[in-house]
Curated annotation (Swiss-Prot):
<feature type="binding site">
    <location>
        <position position="9"/>
    </location>
    <ligand>
        <name>a divalent metal cation</name>
    </ligand>
</feature>
<dbReference type="GO" id="GO:0004309">
    <property type="term" value="F:exopolyphosphatase activity"/>
</dbReference>
<dbReference type="GO" id="GO:0008254">
    <property type="term" value="F:3'-nucleotidase activity"/>
</dbReference>
<dbReference type="GO" id="GO:0005737">
    <property type="term" value="C:cytoplasm"/>
</dbReference>
<comment type="similarity">
    <text>Belongs to the SurE nucleotidase family.</text>
</comment>
<feature type="binding site">
    <location>
        <position position="97"/>
    </location>
    <ligand>
        <name>a divalent metal cation</name>
    </ligand>
</feature>
<keyword id="KW-0479">Metal-binding</keyword>
<dbReference type="InterPro" id="IPR030048">
    <property type="entry name" value="SurE"/>
</dbReference>
<protein>
    <recommendedName>
        <fullName>5'-nucleotidase SurE</fullName>
        <ecNumber>3.1.3.5</ecNumber>
    </recommendedName>
</protein>
<dbReference type="GO" id="GO:0008253">
    <property type="term" value="F:5'-nucleotidase activity"/>
</dbReference>
<dbReference type="GO" id="GO:0046872">
    <property type="term" value="F:metal ion binding"/>
</dbReference>
<dbReference type="GO" id="GO:0000166">
    <property type="term" value="F:nucleotide binding"/>
</dbReference>
<keyword id="KW-0963">Cytoplasm</keyword>
<keyword id="KW-0547">Nucleotide-binding</keyword>
<keyword id="KW-0378">Hydrolase</keyword>
<feature type="binding site">
    <location>
        <position position="8"/>
    </location>
    <ligand>
        <name>a divalent metal cation</name>
    </ligand>
</feature>
<dbReference type="InterPro" id="IPR036523">
    <property type="entry name" value="SurE-like_sf"/>
</dbReference>
C-alpha cells in the first residue's frame, strides 16, 4: 500500500505528523508533500503565473521526510502525481487539518481541494479535519484514520472517479460515527472593516459560523455538533442534473443557437 499525505497547514504541521505516525506501519510507502507554510482557505487554486519551487523537507537531525512546495495544496498533489513520485500511490490523504471543513466551507478548503486534486488524477482520496483548534486533540483523529484505512481498501469501489470522502472529527471523545451530507454554513459579521493610520480602509475576513437551516443531525455540521465523526461523500461533478433536464424543456433550439 502506497499513500501520499498532504495538507494545507504546512509540511511541519502536527496534524500531518500525527497522521504519518498513525499509518506508518500500515503502508509499504508513505510519501509526504505539503506547502511551505499555512495555505488555509486557498480553495483549488493552482500556481500558473510564476515558477513553483520544490525542496526536500528535512528535520534538524538530517532525516528527510518529503517535499516542501512554495505553492498551494492543489499544487502539491498535482506536482507529486504528475512529476515527483516514482510511482502512483494507492491513496491520497489530506490532513489532519487543524479546524473543521464542514458544509459549504469545502469550496474554500485547501485540505479538501488537495484531496480533490488526487481524485482528478485518478487516485482515491480522503480529506480529514479536526473540528477543533487545539493541537493536543489530533490523537483521536489519527486513530480514526488508522481504523478507517483497512475499510477504505476493502471497499474501494466507493471511490469512483467522481467521489472522495470528507471526514470531520469532533473535539474530545467522539460518541459515534455518522454518514452525512454537506450542511449549509454561513458566517455572521463576516467582514471586519478597519482604518489604517493613513485613514485608508482595510478588511479582515472573520465572522462566526452558523447554519441558516438550524440543527440537522443528517448534515456534517449537525453530526460534529452532536460529537459524532462525520463522513461525507463529496462529488467532483458539480452539475445540477435536474436543472439540466429542465433547461432541455425550454422552447429554445439550443443546437441552432
Amino acid at each position: 500500500m502506497r499513500i501520499l499525505l498532504t495538507n494545507d497547514d504546512g509540511i511541519f504541521a502536527p496534524g500531518l505528523e500525527a497522521l504519518r505516525n498513525a499509518l506508518s506501519d500500515l503502508a509499504e510507502t508513505i510519501y509526504i508533500i505539503a506547502p511551505d507554510r499555512e495555505r488555509s482557505a486557498t480553495g483549488h487554486s493552482i500556481t500558473v503565473h510564476r515558477p513553483i519551487r520544490v525542496r526536500e523537507a528535512c528535520h534538524a537531525d538530517g532525516n528527510c521526510c518529503g517535499w516542501i512546495v512554495d505553492g498551494t495544496p492543489a499544487d502539491c498533489v498535482k506536482l507529486a502525481l504528475e512529476s515527483l513520485l516514482p510511482e502512483t500511490p494507492d491513496l491520497v490523504i489530506s490532513g489532519i487539518n487543524l479546524g473543521p471543513n464542514l458544509g459549504t466551507d469545502v469550496l474554500y478548503s485547501g485540505t479538501v481541494s488537495a484531496a480533490m486534486e488526487g481524485l482528478i488524477n485518478g487516485v482515491p482520496s480522503l480529506a480529514i479535519s479536526l473540528a477543533s483548534h487545539r493541537e493536543a486533540e489530533f490523537e483521536e483523529a489519527a486513530a480514526f484514520a488508522r481504523r478507517l484505512l483497512p475499510l477504505v481498501f476493502e471497499y474501494r469501489e466507493i471511490f469512483t472517479a467522481n467521489t472522495l470522502l470528507n471526514i470531520n472529527v469532533p473535539p474530545g471523545k467522539p460518541v459515534g460515527v455518522r454518514l452525512t451530507r454537506l450542511g449549509n454554513l454561513r458566517y455572521a459579521d463576516a467582514v471586519d472593516r478597519r482604518v489604517d493610520p493613513r485613514g485608508r480602509y482595510y478588511y479582515w475576513m472573520a465572522g462566526k459560523p452558523f447554519s441558516p437551516d438550524g440543527h440537522d443531525p443528517d448534515t456534517d455540521i449537525g453530526a460534529v455538533k452532536d460529537r459524532h465523526i462525520s463522513i461525507t461523500p463529496v462529488k467532483i461533478d458539480l452539475t445540477d442534473y435536474e436543472a439540466l433536464d429542465a433547461l432541455k424543456k425550454w422552447p429554445v433550439d439550443w443546437k441552432g443557437s
